[in-house]
Amino acid sequence: MKRKTGFFFDERCFWHSTGLHAVTLPVGEWVQPPAGGGHAESPETKRRMKNLMDVSGLTPQLALRSAAPASLEDLRRIHPDSYLERFKAISDNGGGMLGKEAPLGPGSYEIACLSAGLACAAVEAVLKGELDNAYSLSRPPGHHCLPDQSMGFCFLANIPIAVERAKAQLGLGKVAIIDWDVHHGNGTQHIYLQRDDVLTISLHQDGCFPPGYAGEDDRGVGAGEGYNINIPLLAGAGDDSWRYALETIVIPALARFEPELIIIACGYDANAMDPLARMQLHSDSFRAMTEQVQQAADRLCGGKLVMVHEGGYAESYVPFCGLAVMEALSGIRTEVQDPLLEFIQQQQPRATFAQFQRQAIDRLAQQFGLL
């Protein structure tokens, strides 16, 4: 079914600079300058995704929009002034390191506000019925950012900022946030850990980032108990494991919660080519996962689904995964063929691995009363 799908994008988000790094290591001492590329969180994966959308003919069939930056009032609903002032000071003084794995350059504060503003505008357009669903190509990402601490390439909590603005201005009630970035959505979890009006679900590689974290036992605190679900998957997990986790835990949890809006923190770093993880997803995995959640949104909240870009660091492959997601969101199939699809499908884990992972997923589903 063809939908009116929004794509929120601004060239200036590509101008956020992460400085001179070799993947994630600052150049200096024993770390040599890279022969090519640079920091993993470069603009190229996002730019190339948009490029492929353009040449495929998909972009003109979408509602292409930009947005105003998130306001100081928007930011203050999540972040204290002391943090925002420190962030802006470093940005104004040419950049530096704001937190763990959080390098920034000149002007990064204003660009981060724009990144959050794109997410806010996408949420508002869907809630107001201007669009059926939407995608925000936000950069820098946001799902690792704590209220007073940046980390993991994230400086502002894009999705919580958008959610809280919609609650304040549009009366939004219950929201479900699904994070399928391969790294745990620790920032979003922290912000909503004590709340029962926001369901947070993170699917991630066990122990990847933050290093050593799995999170099965972190299920919320106080009023929020039971409203935070972590699904750690073993390194090497592929299409079967991720889609089974959605089918067995995520979709039933959504049905039980009955949200008014579903947001996906959409990272592509669980793809088989990513340098910062060890998973085995391909473009059709992301296509099918998007379709699964969109179908749930159709049943539960009038189809209201917003996706906000997070990670994904394989410049050659993220564009194919991102295009597959946009095709699934919009209901428009292009002529583009994924040149690595068959190759990655042949690399999928053997049945014994998939069965072992399914058993772990079943146990977790039982603990949450979903089986």
What is the role of each PLM region?
Residues L62-G99:
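Cationic, histidine-enriched alpha-helical/coil surfaces that engage anionic ligands
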Residues M1-R77:
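N-terminal low-complexity, Ser/Thr- and acidic-residue-enriched intrinsically disordered segments
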